[in-house]
């Protein structure tokens, strides 16, 4: 850990700024600021070599630690008791998002990992879902940065567009809460959009969104199973299952269960949530520090187009399913 200290210190200090800005601009959020700051750092500053081990470690390990601590704010029992009724909307829209990202990702010649991350982020809970899936599929920093940037862009758009459309279509608080909870990616954006519509819509959307976020677990397990199956097909299955199962997903589940059964004092939960946000910001600074604007230009508009199509498919399917079920 000694050789990582300098880089970790840089990531920590730089992460404080995005977290501060995220409190003042919750629509954008600390994750966006952290990723941009990391990229700007890489572009404008010639980073010393002894900072690289710590920054690289932040981008990989702290990303996983942020997911573990996020588990404490997602108590499975509490969310499930109130949000199961929304699954008949959430599950089909999650499927639609994945299929749209995979199909159109192939059409626009996106790399396999990039289209998977865009689909995962659109389907479940934005940056947190991408952070959970990236280590499992062994995505690189460029793929993480491109997918997160795509998701963050549409999160910000949704905050402004969804309430306007809700009023134009005269949606009830229940309808808008269900729609925004199933069709907007990031939790902060869901909260911003839904509570701007009404308090009742905001409360409904939050429950739906948390229920949707819990799908991180089964979908990650599905990715693990797929990876194991492919390894088996290639004759590399000996000892692979142990290597494939990511320890941080196991600890995420443990954290959620501990929170559900009340073993974690309520007074501690806000601090654990803040720690998750800090680790995520530090991780994104580390990831951004290995990405350049040239890589974004080289990728072109394809990631945004795939993200846009997947987003439209999710929003549209959510509305159609509401008309069928309610």
Predicted region positions:
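Structural signature of multi-pass alpha-helical membrane transport proteins
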Residues: 2-59, 70-78, 221-279, 283-300, ...
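Helix-coil boundary and interhelical linker segments in multi-pass alpha-helical membrane proteins
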Residues: 20-23, 76-85, 166-175, 195-204, ...
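Structural signature of hydrophobic alpha-helical transmembrane segments
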Residues: 26-40, 82-95, 119-122, 148, ...
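Helix-loop-helix hairpins and the membrane-proximal interhelical loops
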Residues: 58, 66-112, 134-152
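Transmembrane alpha-helices that form the ion-translocation and gating core
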Residues: 88-122, 153-171, 298, 305-326
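Alpha-helical membrane segments and immediately flanking helix-loop junctions
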Residues: 111-158, 175-198, 275
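Membrane-embedded alpha-helical segments of transport systems
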Residues: 147-162, 182-191, 207-221, 311-314
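Oxyanion-binding "anion nests"
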Residues: 197-238
């Amino acid at each position: 850990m000694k050789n990582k200290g300098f880089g970790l210190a840089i990531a920590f200090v730089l992460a404080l700024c995005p977290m501060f800005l995220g409190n003042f601009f919750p629509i954008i959020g600390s994750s966006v600021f952290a990723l941009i700051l990391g990229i700007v750092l890489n572009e404008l500053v010639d980073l010393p070599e002894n900072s690289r081990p710590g920054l690289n470690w932040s981008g990989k390990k702290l990303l996983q630690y942020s997911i573990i601590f996020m588990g404490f704010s997602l108590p499975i029992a509490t969310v499930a008791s109130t949000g199961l009724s929304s699954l008949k909307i959430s599950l089909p829209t999650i499927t639609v998002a994945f299929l749209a990202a995979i199909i159109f990702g192939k059409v626009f010649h996106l790399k396999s990992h990039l289209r998977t991350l865009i689909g995962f982020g659109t389907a479940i809970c934005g940056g947190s879902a991408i952070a959970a899936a990236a280590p499992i599929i062994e995505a690189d920093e460029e793929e993480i940065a491109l997918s997160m940037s795509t998701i963050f862009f549409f999160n910000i758009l949704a905050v402004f567009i969804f309430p306007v459309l809700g009023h134009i279509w005269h949606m009830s608080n229940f309808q808008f809460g269900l729609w925004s909870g199933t069709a907007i990616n990031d939790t902060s954006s869901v909260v911003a959009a839904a509570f701007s519509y009404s308090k009742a819509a905001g409360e409904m959307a939050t429950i739906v969104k948390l229920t949707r976020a819990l799908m991180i677990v089964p979908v990650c397990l599905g990715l693990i199973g797929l990876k194991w199956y492919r390894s088996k097909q290639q004759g590399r299955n000996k000892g692979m299952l142990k290597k494939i199962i990511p320890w941080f997903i196991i600890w995420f589940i443990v954290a959620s269960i501990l929170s559900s059964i009340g073993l974690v004092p309520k007074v501690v939960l806000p601090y654990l949530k803040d720690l998750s946000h800090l680790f995520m910001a530090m991780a994104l600074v580390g990831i951004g520090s290995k990405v350049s604007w040239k890589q974004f230009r080289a990728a072109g508009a394809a990631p945004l187009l795939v993200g846009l199509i997947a987003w439209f498919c999710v929003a549209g399917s959510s509305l159609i399913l509401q008309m069928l079920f309610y």
